[in-house]
Amino acid sequence: MDMRSHEMIERRREDNGNNNGGVVISNIISTNIDDNCNGNNNNTRVSCNSQTLDHHQSKSPSSFSISAAAKPTVRYRECLKNHAASVGGSVHDGCGEFMPSGEEGTIEALRCAACDCHRNFHRKEMDGVGSSDLISHHRHHHYHHNQYGGGGGRRPPPPNMMLNPLMLPPPPNYQPIHHHKYGMSPPGGGGMVTPMSVAYGGGGGGAESSSEDLNLYGQSSGEGAGAAAGQMAFSMSSSKKRFRTKFTTDQKERMMDFAEKLGWRMNKQDEEELKRFCGEIGVKRQVFKVWMHNNKNNAKKPPTPTTTL
C-alpha cells in the first residue's frame, strides 16, 4: 500500500483597522490514496473552511450562562415606630405604607409624607417576601447561629417580633412578700402598730397608746430610714385596728405626777424607782414610756394668761 500526503499551510495576516486584527487560517489538505490491492484510485480532497478567530469576540460557554442578577424590588410597608416606647407602652400611628415626601435622591425622600417618620421605621419587603417569611427565616437563622456558632454580635429581632414588657404575665410562683417582723400581731389579739400611729395618738381621753408602739418605733429608727419607710408603707395598707391601752383617771393622775418628777424623761439612775412605780399602778414600763412620750408636749405648755378688766 503506497500513500502520498501533501500538506500546505498558508498563513495570512490582514489588518482590518482594528487594534487587534483577526488571524485567518486556511488549511487545505489533499490526500491521494492509491489502492493497488483493489485496483481502484480514490481521490479525496478535504477542504477546511477558513475560520476567523477574534479573542475579543470568543468567550467561554460559562460566560454566556451567567447573567446579571436583576435588582430586587424593595417596598416599605406599614410603620412600626412605637411612639410610647419612652414610657414603656406600645402605640403605633397606623400608617399603612411608606410614601416619600420628596424626589428620589433627596433627604426628603427618606421621610414619610403620611406619618412623618423615617423610612427605616417602616417594614421592609423585598420581592413579595412577607412578614411571615421573614419571621420564619429569622428563626431558622437564629437556630443555626446558636447551634453552630457565629461571629459578631447578636442581631436584634424584627420589630414585629418584640414583646411589650407591659403585656407579660407575672411568674406563676409569684407571691407578695410579707414583712413578718413588723406585720405580726401581738399574742393579745391586737393589730399591727406603727410609728405613725404613735404620732397621732394624742394625749387626752380615756384611750392611750400601748407598749408595742414605742418598741416598733425604736426598731425602725435603729435599722435606718429605708426599713422605716417600707414598714410604714406596709402598715398603711393594713385594715386592722391597732391595740390601745385604756387608763383610769387615778392612773393618769399618778402618771402625770411621776412624769413631772422625772422631768418627762427616763434616766438610768431612776430605773429602780420606775419599776416600783409601774408595779404599784399596774402599768407596764413600755406602756408608761409611750404615754409619757405622747403627753409630754401637752404637759409642758404654759397655761394661757387670763386678762382682767
Curated annotation (Swiss-Prot):
The homeodomain differs form the typical one by having namely 4 instead of 3 extra amino acids inserted in the loop between helix 1 and helix 2. Coiled coil: none annotated. Homo- and heterodimer with other ZFHD proteins. Interacts with MIF1, MIF2 and MIF3; these interactions prevent nuclear localization and DNA-binding to inhibit transcription regulation activity. Binds to ZHD1, ZHD2, ZHD4, ZHD10 and ZHD11. PANTHER family: ZINC-FINGER HOMEODOMAIN PROTEIN 2, ZINC-FINGER HOMEODOMAIN PROTEIN 5. It comes from Arabidopsis thaliana (Mouse-ear cress). Its main location: nucleus. Residues 240-303 bind DNA. One of its GO terms (biological process) is positive regulation of DNA-templated transcription. One of its GO terms (molecular function) is DNA-binding transcription factor activity. GO terms for cellular component: nucleus. This is Zinc-finger homeodomain protein 5.
